[in-house]
Amino acid sequence: MQFDVFNGDADGICSLLQLRLEDPVESQLVTGIKRDIALLERVAAEEGDHVTVLDLSMVKNRDALNRLLAAGVNVDYVDHHAAGDIPDHSNLTVTISEAPEVCTALLINGRLRGAQVAWAIAGAFGDNLDEPASQVARKAGFSERDTTQLRELGICLNYNGYGPSLEDLHFHPANLYGALYEAQSPAAFAASNAFRKLQDGYREDVAASEALAPVHVQPGFAVYQLPNASWARRVSGVFSNDLVRAFPARAHAVLTERNDGSFLVSVRAPFERRTGAETVCSQFATGGGREAAAGINRLPAEQLDQLIGALSAEYDG
C-alpha cells in the first residue's frame, strides 16, 4: 500500500502534485494544517508498504520514522527543514537540503528534471522564495504574465494552510490537493470556482490586516499581534512574508491569539540575512522550522518576554 504524507501548505501540496502527475498511484493521503507536522505517527503502514514524506521536519517525526523502518516499511523522505540525525537504514531514501533558497517542491522538480515545473514554481512562490521561483520560471520559458499567475496561485495555496485548526481553512488540504490534481495544470485550476473562492478569501483577509501596527519594535526586529479571529489565523503566514518584503533588514514575529490565551507564532528572519528563525523558535517546546522561517505552535502568554529576549539575542547582537 502507498501512503502519501505531506504538509498542507503550498510546498507540500505542489510537491505531491508533481510526483503523482508523473507517477499516478492509488494512495492514502495523510495531511493537515501547515503547523500539523508530526504526521508520520498517523501512518499505520505494514511490512512491504511504501510511504512518501514531503515537506515535514524529520526532527518532529523521527520516532514514528524509526518505528516504520523497523516494521519493514519503505520510506522516501524529501524535505528542506532541519533534519537532525538521519537514520542509516536500507529502507530509507532521503533527499534533504536545508539551504535557505530551497524548498521541497524545488527538490522534487530536480528529481523529475522539470517534468511538472509549473507546480514547482507555484510551490516555491508559496514558500516565499520569490527569487528562486522566478529564476526557474525564466529558465523554463514562462512569460511574465504566467509567472505572475503562478505566484498568486502559490501564495493562495499557502494561505489556505494556516490556522490552528482545519475549521479555519477554506479547504481541507487533502480536498484542495484533489481539486488541483483533477485540474492537472495551474492554468486550469486558476479558471475554477475553487480558486476564485480561495482568491477572494485571501484578498479579504489581507485587507483586514493592513491596519495592523507592531506592538514591540527594536532595531533588529518587530513583533505584531493579531486578534483571535479566523481571518487573522488564516492570514498570519502571508502577513509575515509580506513584512519581510516590506522591511528586509529586520526580523518579524507575528503572534496570533488562540482560544486558550496562548499564541500561535510565525517568525521570519530578515530577508537580507535569512538565518536565525529556527534558532529562536526551537528554544520553545512547540517550536521549530527552518533558518529563514519558523514558528511556535503554542506559546504561553507568560513566555512572551522570553520570546522577545530570544529575538533580541539573535537579531540585535
Per-range role (PLM):
Residues 58, 159-171, 192-204, 234-241:
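Short N-terminal helix-initiation segments at or just after the protein's N-terminus
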Residues 98-99, 178-225:
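Oxyanion-binding "anion nests"
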Residues 104, 172-176, 194, 198-205, ...:
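Alpha-helical structural motif
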Residues 133, 137-184:
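Loop-centered beta-sheet repeat module
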